[in-house]
Amino acid sequence: MTEKIRECIRQFLQMEAAGGILLLVFSVGAVIFANSPLRDHYFSFLNAPVIIQFGSIVELNKPLLMWVNDGFMAIFFVLVGLEVKREMLIGAISSYQKAIFPAIAACGGMIVPALVYWLVNQGVPDYHGGWAIPMATDIAFAIGVLVLLGTRVPLALKVFLLALAIIDDLGAIIVIALFFSHDLSTKALILASIAIVGLILLNRFKVSNLIAYVVVGIILWVSVLKSGVHATLAGVIIGFCVPLKGKNNSEPLVEMEHAIAPWSSFLILPLFAFCNAGIPLSGLGMEALTSPLTLGVTLGLLLGKPIGVFLFSYLSVKLHIAKLPEGINFKQIFAVSVLCGIGFTMSMFLASLAFGGGDGHLTAYARLGILFGSSVSAVVGYWLLFVTTKENANQ
């Protein structure tokens, strides 16, 4: 592994860890606000209308919550697209040998949680739409837990989690594209296609000016928003179209990644957590705790994730499809697989897509399951990592 890649991973881990702490603070703050005398102000804040108009051509009128989920999260997904592309070209999944082990683990971590959710909710048709919620891994929280253990965690284990989470994000993107698009508009899709062609041409000619990608990207985002396809996919496309190498030895991808990453970690994701984690607990009794929806999400994260990630990882090695990275063992892989049950922001995002956001009881049940499953996964995962990395601490 080159020094450049090591430095890139180090900076990424530090940024995600700090962001994870902020996510926790803003999430707790959201729950406090939603259950305090200020709850009416909290929900009024979320539903406050925000209007952006460009003459008579475009008018976007949405509540603040939707601007956060459709707008700010699109910027986050630009970062996801940039990270996935970078890792595919020069990083942790840049070759078959590097990618196959975390890729198989990620597949298990998506398939088994969805299956667990479906088994719990198969008798309740109204809940079927939430099957994708426990598939996601929140890389900020997961990396944050890893960083708490410092140097006792092997670099190979950190790289494994990073690669797995990135492939997991890619899976979430595919799920959003295939299952959460509706009422498609042909005109908007044509305009979006033209914008995509524009981005591809910018990439083809290795244009280094990031403003060009921002301008065409905004056109793409508005078009996708109007098309019926979820607007965050525009962010991913923008990220994929920024070239790794530009003219005059410039690095547009790295430049844009460094420009967006602090905003994503310290503003966008904390704001998303604050707007989506506020669950009014006063109206939730045993019915909420024992609901198949809540249980399906909780068990999907707590059991489905570790079983899927570990089982697929173990079988891939035993069947000689992949090799266990040097310096780590299956006990540590299992500990990381439990950490993958921290779904949080990505799971919250998928819940808002599945059940329409807002403060409806389906969304509240899903969020309750996400908070419980993610919290227990974080605590148990930390303890398992602490136990399984004792030898590293003694060296």
From Swiss-Prot:
Signal sequence segment: none
Please give, as recorded in its UniProt entry, the membrane topology of this protein.
Multi-pass membrane protein
Q: Cross-referenced Pfam families, in alphabetical order?
A: Na_H_antiport_1
- What's its catalytic activity? Na(+)(in) + 2 H(+)(out) = Na(+)(out) + 2 H(+)(in)
UniProt keyword list: Antiport, Cell inner membrane, Cell membrane, Ion transport, Membrane, Sodium, Sodium transport, Transmembrane, Transmembrane helix, Transport
GO MF term (any one) = sodium:proton antiporter activity
Segments spanning the bilayer are 18-38, 64-84, 100-120, 129-149, 160-180, 182-202, 205-225, 226-246, 266-286, 295-315, 333-353, 368-388
Q: Give an example GO biological process.
A: regulation of pH
Chief location of this protein? membrane
**Where does it reside?**
Cell inner membrane
Name the domain of life this protein comes from. Bacteria
Q: Which GO terms describe its cellular component?
A: plasma membrane
InterPro entries the UniProt entry points to: Na/H_antiporter_dom_sf, NhaA
The job of this chain, per UniProt, is described as:
Na(+)/H(+) antiporter that extrudes sodium in exchange for external protons.
Family statement: Belongs to the NhaA Na(+)/H(+) (TC 2.A.33) antiporter family.
Read off the PANTHER family from this record: NA(+)_H(+) ANTIPORTER NHAA (PTHR30341:SF0), SODIUM ION/PROTON ANTIPORTER NHAA-RELATED (PTHR30341)
Q: Which HAMAP family match?
A: NhaA
What's this protein's name?
Na(+)/H(+) antiporter NhaA
Native organism:
Histophilus somni (strain 129Pt) (Haemophilus somnus)
Q: What gene is this protein translated from?
A: nhaA
